[in-house]
A protein has these predicted regions:
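Hydrophobic alpha-helical transmembrane segments
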Residues: 2-13, 144-157
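Hydrophobic, membrane-inserted alpha-helices
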Residues: 132-141
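N-terminal signal-anchor transmembrane alpha helix of single-pass membrane proteins
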Residues: 8-26
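Short, structured loop/turn "capping" segments at alpha-beta junctions
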Residues: 116, 134-135, 148
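Generic low-complexity, intrinsically disordered sequence content enriched
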Residues: 23, 59, 140-141
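Alpha-helical transmembrane segments of multi-pass membrane proteins
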Residues: 17-21, 157-168
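Polar-ligand-bearing catalytic/cofactor-coordination segments
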Residues: 26-130, 166-223
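Residue-level signal for the membrane-embedded core of alpha-helical transmembrane segments
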Residues: 129-132, 154
Length: 223
């Protein structure tokens, strides 16, 4: 086998891993949901209340917390500004619901400190990419030309997009850290072992890593 072919095959392998990364994150998320997902918050508040408490403590009460019925809810909209929560999280009283709502409030804190950056725009692009890449891959496979080179270029693009997504994820980690600290300072996490709390905030981060799968037609069909 020629060295060039070996390199292309290696690129394709890493590209395949990049494309599978959101699904792998989703599988890890589901495992945590199965283990800890039924744990209710001891303090008894819901996702809406948790987000509002963080916003009030962060002195940004002007940020709304809205219940959203659209398919792709659960995001922070800096233009309004508002936190959009799905009904399950808005009314939810599970520890995971609270952590998810709190992480979005953490993005509002980043916005307050001018550290939000372009995360919202990037996430919208990742949803678009997650919907488009399977169709693009099929189109490339049925096209004429040199398929190995075409696949190599495609997987190189896929790997680059995934790498940038992981780099952007630093903002999500920071938002989760801010949310964790705010809830802890408000003593809303009292009564929960550290293992449960860590799992809840890990899930909020996995939500973001799994975004190109969960918020696409593939996620709707196969999860």
């Amino acid at each position: 086998m020629a060295p060039e072919t070996k390199i292309l095959l290696l690129v394709c392998f890493f590209g395949a891993l990049a494309l599978a990364a959101p699904w792998i994150a989703w599988k890890r998320l589901k495992a945590l949901e199965a283990k800890f997902g039924r744990v209710l918050l001891v303090r008894g508040i819901n996702g809406e209340q948790a987000a509002k408490i963080i916003l009030l403590r962060g002195e940004i009460p002007q940020v709304d917390v809205d219940e959203s019925h659209i398919l792709f809810a659960d995001n922070y909209s800096p233009g309004e500004p508002a936190i959009k929560l799905s009904s399950n999280i808005y009314h939810g009283k599970r520890l995971f619901d609270i952590a998810r709502a709190a992480r979005l409030a953490g993005h509002a804190l980043q916005h307050r400190d001018r550290k939000l950056g372009s995360l919202a725009s990037w996430d919208a692009f990742m949803v678009l990419w997650g919907n488009a890449w399977p169709l693009l891959l099929v189109a490339l496979l049925v096209s004429h030309g040199r398929p190995l080179i075409t696949m190599g270029l495609f997987t190189l693009v896929a790997g680059t997009v995934t790498l940038v997504h992981f780099l952007k994820h630093a903002q999500v980690r920071d938002a989760a850290r801010r949310a964790h600290r705010a809830l802890a300072e408000a003593k809303l996490l009292d009564g929960h072992p550290e293992e449960e709390i860590e799992a809840a905030f890990l899930v909020t981060r996995l939500d973001h890593l799994a975004l190109p799968f969960t918020k696409t037609w593939m996620g709707v069909m196969f999860r």
